[in-house]
Each structure stands twice: as structure tokens, then as C-alpha cells.
UniProtKB/Swiss-Prot annotation:
GO biological process, one term: cholecystokinin signaling pathway
Transmembrane portions of the chain: none
Post-translational modification note: The precursor is cleaved by proteases to produce a number of active cholecystokinins.
Stated name of the protein: Cholecystokinin
Tissue: Expressed and secreted by discrete enteroendocrine cells that reside as single cells scattered among enterocytes in the mucosa of the small intestine. Released into the blood following ingestion of a meal.
Length: 115
């Protein structure tokens, strides 16, 4: 999970660095073509001005990503639960069946020992 977060941080820093670099205007002879090329840049600048500080937006985005990662089911247990729910005749229900010795939940009085 830490590697995923680190990867997101690196990607966000690279994207912010690329957006912060000034763009060298191409030599366009047609004014209509030049306006068409500048329109996305103007929109991006307007969004950046209205959103506020880029670091605050990055922090909010990372916080939202971390919340989604924590809520998402992961690992082997989620796969096992899905497999058990598919077969209703499965004998093991909630990891408890006859003959299973769970030392943490049962006391010695529950069992009859031959003497």
C-alpha cells in the first residue's frame, strides 16, 4: 500500500511540475489557429486561479485516495468470503465446524475427556 501512495505522490509532483513550466508558443501564422491552441491553456489557467493553492488541492486528492484504499476490500479474505458465499452447501461457516479446536473461544469444560 505504501508503494501505491508513493507512486501517486511522485506522479502528482511530476504532473504539477509539467503544468508549471512555461510553454514556448509555436510560430503560428494563422491567428485562428493560434487562438485555438491557446484556448485550452486559458481554461487551465482559469481553473488553477479559481481552485486556489495547488498543494491544498493535491493534499485533498491524496486524502480522498487514501480513504478509498482503506475502504476497499483487499487481500485473501475478501476472495475467500466471495467464494464461500457462492456455494451454500459449503461445510465451513465462519471458520467453525465440528472437530475444530479453537483454543481461544472454548473452555475445557465444554469437552468430555476419557478418564
Amino acid at each position: 500500500m505504501k508503494s501505491g501512495v508513493c507512486l501517486c505522490v511522485v506522479m502528482a509532483v511530476l504532473a504539477a511540475g509539467a503544468l508549471a513550466q512555461p510553454v514556448v508558443p509555436a510560430e503560428a501564422t494563422d491567428p485562428v489557429e493560434q487562438r485555438a491552441q491557446e484556448a485550452p491553456r486559458r481554461q487551465l489557467r482559469a481553473v488553477l486561479r479559481t481552485d486556489g493553492e495547488p498543494r491544498a488541492r493535491l493534499g485533498a486528492l491524496l486524502a480522498r485516495y487514501i480513504q478509498q484504499v482503506r475502504k476497499a476490500p483487499s487481500g485473501r479474505m475478501s476472495v475467500l468470503k466471495n467464494l464461500q458465499s457462492l456455494d451454500p452447501s459449503h461445510r465451513i461457516s465462519d471458520r467453525d465446524y465440528m472437530g475444530w479446536m479453537d483454543f481461544g473461544r472454548r473452555s475445557a469444560e465444554d469437552y468430555e475427556y476419557p478418564s
